[in-house]
């Protein structure tokens, strides 16, 4: 089989194996996960000793625990990952969740997780695609998901004009796949508004 990087770049192979692989390439996620797994286990052990945990899904990393342990442990983790995997922390994409203000000792460059809604900051974050935070934060992000699905349904309607049965089959399959995940993992009271909005759009 031809290297995927060559297929994506007009037959020209770029880089060395040690420099990584193409983002979005099918094996990239698995290779990434294996590459930093030893360091992830060490990080988890450190925070687990004080009641915390470190979990990762592909390149999404979540660490919880007392700030005086989490912040130094995360800095050590990223220093080791940089040395072993040549991966750098993107601080602009790293957030700290707190119900109140940013905790004392928060490393520079890390923002508070949440969204500004109607002039009020609502703490929250996305955990494996599921919004977690204040009720306002959760409902806002579920509404965004419904609008995303609605845009896709509109595209289906535009492409399949006049094909009623095909439109219903594809639109239903698409919405079920997109929203079932949220239906199974969000509180029913949070999903109710989003589900009613989806019903109205359909």
Feature annotation, model-predicted:
Residues 1-202:
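Nucleic-acid-interacting cores, centered on viral/eukaryotic replication and modification enzymes
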């Amino acid at each position: 089989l031809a290297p995927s990087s060559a297929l994506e770049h007009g037959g020209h192979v770029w880089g060395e194996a040690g420099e990584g692989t193409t983002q979005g390439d099918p094996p990239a996620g698995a290779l990434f996960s294996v590459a930093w797994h030893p360091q992830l286990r060490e990080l988890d052990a450190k925070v687990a000793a004080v009641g915390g945990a470190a979990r990762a899904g592909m390149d999404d990393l979540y660490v919880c625990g007392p700030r005086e342990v989490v912040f130094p442990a995360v800095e050590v983790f990223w220093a080791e990952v940089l040395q072993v995997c040549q991966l750098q922390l993107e601080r602009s994409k790293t957030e700290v969740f707190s119900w109140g203000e940013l905790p004392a000792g928060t490393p520079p460059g890390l923002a508070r997780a949440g969204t500004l809604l109607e002039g009020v900051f609502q703490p929250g974050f996305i955990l494996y695609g599921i919004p977690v935070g204040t009720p306002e934060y959760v409902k806002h992000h579920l509404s965004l998901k419904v609008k995303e699905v609605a845009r896709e349904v509109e595209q289906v309607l535009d492409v399949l004009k006049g094909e009623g049965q095909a439109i219903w089959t594809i639109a239903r399959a698409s919405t079920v796949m997109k929203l079932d995940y949220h239906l199974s993992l969000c509180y029913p009271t949070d999903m109710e508004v989003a589900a009613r909005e989806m019903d109205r759009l359909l």
